[in-house]
């Protein structure tokens, strides 16, 4: 390995955050990238622009033996970008698998990677209790922890304890709701809106906001996956960011009562008054319709791959303000921002180009 070469291990590389990280790292010539996921992927082929720089490993991170066996050759890793997630029905049930996966990765790689410089941990606003109900806004990185269970906090505590006396450092990245491209992902709001709008259009219906009445008027923010990737790599490579947490957001706020009509216009839909309804319930019978739409419009992805209804219900239930203070990242040197409206339109266009939606 050249002294100037950086070797990234992206954990959870098929998710909306992991995909963004991989895409960004491959634009930077000094990086080689190894991707971990349950499904694996296709390595860069000979003669391609990423030849020798991209490879995939399919691994069950909940299995310590499989993790150690599959990762035993990763001796040149310099940076671990951890963005894996396992969904569970309750907050308490989220803790054991999500903590175990991080522990298994670190315990497999750290002892064999002498050049390890940094471990980046992807978190979120659950650290602030945002999922539990109205919380202090803007949320700041210095805010105190809340009553457990909370796997994000347990993961950070593990890294802090593991890092003491070591040469490597860590960072904790805290985005808001992330917008980007990923299939079969349980937390993809842009996919929720795109598929919901496409089905509404196919049925000749206006686009109704389906969340709680109070959620339509509250302040909200999002984080573009590309912006998040840039910030994550910045924090992992800037010494000023060692052992720090950062809120990372697009930099603007919005309310659904202003954004929703703009999204409807992109899909050439009228807007009707909000109507509280569970997407998980009302979209449960729409698979036959989606199959017909796949045939009609030449769409490439089945209903299961594009469905994130439970997460949509979760986000649209926030009848309280949901935003953090992003000034710490700016004070430390990260100044990029993205207009959230433009982010939505770009991602929807990307879905259309890839034949995810009509």
Residue ranges of each PLM-predicted region?
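Active-site Tyr-X1-5-Lys
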Residues: 145-176, 181
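Glycine/proline-rich active-site loop of Rossmann-fold NAD(P)-dependent oxidoreductases
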Residues: 166, 178-196, 226, 235-246
């Amino acid at each position: 390995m050249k002294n100037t070469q950086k070797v990234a291990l992206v954990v959870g590389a098929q998710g909306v955050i992991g995909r963004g990280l991989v895409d960004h790292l491959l634009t930077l010539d000094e990086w080689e990238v190894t991707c971990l996921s349950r499904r694996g992927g296709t390595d860069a082929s000979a003669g391609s622009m990423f030849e020798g720089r991209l490879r995939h490993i399919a691994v069950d991170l909940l299995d310590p033996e499989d993790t150690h066996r599959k990762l035993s050759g990763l001796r040149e890793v310099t940076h671990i970008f951890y963005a894996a997630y396992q969904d569970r029905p309750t907050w308490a049930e989220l803790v054991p698998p999500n903590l175990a996966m991080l522990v298994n990765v670190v315990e497999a790689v750290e002892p064999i990677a002498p050049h390890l410089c940094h471990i980046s941990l992807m978190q979120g606003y659950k650290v602030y209790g945002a999922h539990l109900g109205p919380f202090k806004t803007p949320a700041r990185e210095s805010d105190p922890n809340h009553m457990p269970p909370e796997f994000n906090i347990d993961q950070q505590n593990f890294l802090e304890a593991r890092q003491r006396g070591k040469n490597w450092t860590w960072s904790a990245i805290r985005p808001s709701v992330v917008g980007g491209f990923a299939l079969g992902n349980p937390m993809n709001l842009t996919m929720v809106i795109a598929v919901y709008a496409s089905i509404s259009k196919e049925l000749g219906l206006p686009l109704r906001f389906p969340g709680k009445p109070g959620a339509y008027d509250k302040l909200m923010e999002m984080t573009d996956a590309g912006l998040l990737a840039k910030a994550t790599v910045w924090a992992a490579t800037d010494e000023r960011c060692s052992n720090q947490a950062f809120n990372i957001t697009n930099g603007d706020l919005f309310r659904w009562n202003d954004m929703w009509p703009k999204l409807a216009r992109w899909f050439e839909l009228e807007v009707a008054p909000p109507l509280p309804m569970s997407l998980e319930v009302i979209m449960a019978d729409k698979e036959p319709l989606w199959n017909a739409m796949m045939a009609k419009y030449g769409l490439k992805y089945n209903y299961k791959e594009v469905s994130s209804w439970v997460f949509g219900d979760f986000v649209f239930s926030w009848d309280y303000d949901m935003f953090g203070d992003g000034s710490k990242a700016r004070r430390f040197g990260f100044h990029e921002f993205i207009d959230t409206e433009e982010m939505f339109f770009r991602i929807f266009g990307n879905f259309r180009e890839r034949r995810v939606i009509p």
